[in-house]
Amino acid sequence: MTTLETPMDAASAAASGASATARFHTDKSPYDAVAGTPPERVSDLAREVLSAVHDTVRRHRVTYDEYNALKAWLISVGEDGEWPLFLDVWVEHVIEEVATDHREGNKGTIEGPYYVPNSPERGARGTIPMRDGEQGTPLVWNGTITSTDGTPLAGKVELWHADADGFYSQFAPNLPEWNLRGTFSAGPDGAFQITTIRPAPYQIPTDGACGKLIAAAGWHAWRPAHLHVKVSAPGHELLTAQLYFPGDPHNQDDIASAVKPELVLEPQVHPDGSQSVAYSFVLDPEKN
């Protein structure tokens, strides 16, 4: 398996940002979900965010040159189509933490900007769509879906992840549609088996506005290797998570701050070089 040693090429980063923004614009549900938010809450949130900005300006004595550079950078985030990337990398992990702190079942983490709904169905046991000769270590994943009381759930696991070079289909050129994206339906016993490849760690796109922030701040752009999942079952809360691999140096300093110890897998290595993993999901019933 190869890992990405350089940032995504410029065309891929630009296309990635444009695709993420376009897909978000086609989904009106975020606007509908908050349409009834009371003005008082909107005012409180806006005032507190602005107050935090004002406090930072005063504390660090921000200059006009820095202020104008900030304005130019904020404009470039929109021009580069990188608002989804910016928010998902640096903000979403706290939103997810607050939204799911009541759960008794599995803990989740961020969705990230590269989810695409309606991936191909593959049943309870199947192989994720991939190219002939797909590069990467073969990985077989066995698991179950149950409710918090232990009842098996015939739910679904939507799986998507990067390839062995760190690229996602639908967001990078020269990849087949739905490559390494699939939906698996657990059987009546809640069991599923998925065959895929182990993804690579990668850097988020660095040729746009987010990359300029990373360079100016002296940060790194790496995300550890991970599998994205959405796990659902009727009458239960949707679980969005990422599953990680042991030994990845960026499990400790993920640019997106999304790694949790309980989300790190324990793969078994077989004589032929392939790997297998067992990881199951416990879903919380929906609250009335």
Which positions does each model-derived feature cover?
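N-terminal acidic, proline/glycine-rich, low-complexity intrinsically disordered segments
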Residues: 1-6
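Beta-strand-dominated extracellular/periplasmic modules and repeats
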Residues: 14-288
